[in-house]
């Protein structure tokens, strides 16, 4: 009789790495890219990245709008 195949998750990953290493490696890189992109987008919006100096259209803010405090002036340079 042959030895029974191991059915744990680590043995499954080892077997996949031995049989199709390009797919496993590519999947790991894709997953890492998705995680880094998610972190990058979260940081972009957390640090008010959409507050660009030059926009394609005009935006008018009222004086009591909290976003009016973040408006950049060209005189800031």
UniProtKB/Swiss-Prot annotation:
Signal peptide: none annotated. GO terms for cellular component: mitochondrial inner membrane; respiratory chain complex I; Z disc. GO terms for biological process: mitochondrial electron transport, NADH to ubiquinone. Keywords: Cytoplasm, Electron transport, Membrane, Mitochondrion, Mitochondrion inner membrane, Respiratory chain, Transmembrane, Transmembrane helix, Transport. Disruption phenotype: RNAi-mediated knockdown in muscle results in defective muscle contraction, sarcomeric defects and loss of muscle integrity. RNAi-mediated knockdown in wing imaginal discs results in reduced wing size. The chain crosses the membrane at residues 23-45. The keyword Transport applies. It comes from the Eukaryota. It is found in: Mitochondrion inner membrane; Cytoplasm, Myofibril, Sarcomere; Cytoplasm, Myofibril, Sarcomere, Z line. It is a single-pass membrane protein. Its main location: mitochondrion. Disulfide bonds: none annotated. Belongs to the complex I NDUFA3 subunit family. Complex I is composed of 43 different subunits. Displays weak sequence similarity with mammalian NDUFA3 but is present in the density map in cryo-EM structures in the location of mammalian NDUFA3. Accessory subunit of the mitochondrial membrane respiratory chain NADH dehydrogenase (Complex I), that is believed not to be involved in catalysis. Complex I functions in the transfer of electrons from NADH to the respiratory chain. The immediate electron acceptor for the enzyme is believed to be ubiquinone. Required for the maintenance of muscle integrity and for cell proliferation in the wing imaginal disc epithelium, possibly by interacting with the chaperone-assisted selective autophagy (CASA) pathway. This is NADH dehydrogenase [ubiquinone] 1 alpha subcomplex subunit 3. It comes from Drosophila melanogaster. The gene is NdufA3.
């Amino acid at each position: 009789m042959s030895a029974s195949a191991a059915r744990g998750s680590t043995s499954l990953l080892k077997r996949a790495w031995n049989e199709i290493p390009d797919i496993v490696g590519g999947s790991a890189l894709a997953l890492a890219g998705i995680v880094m992109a998610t972190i990058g987008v979260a940081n972009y919006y957390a640090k008010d990245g959409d507050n660009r100096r030059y926009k394609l259209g005009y935006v008018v803010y009222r004086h009591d709008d909290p976003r009016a405090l973040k408006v950049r002036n060209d005189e800031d340079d």
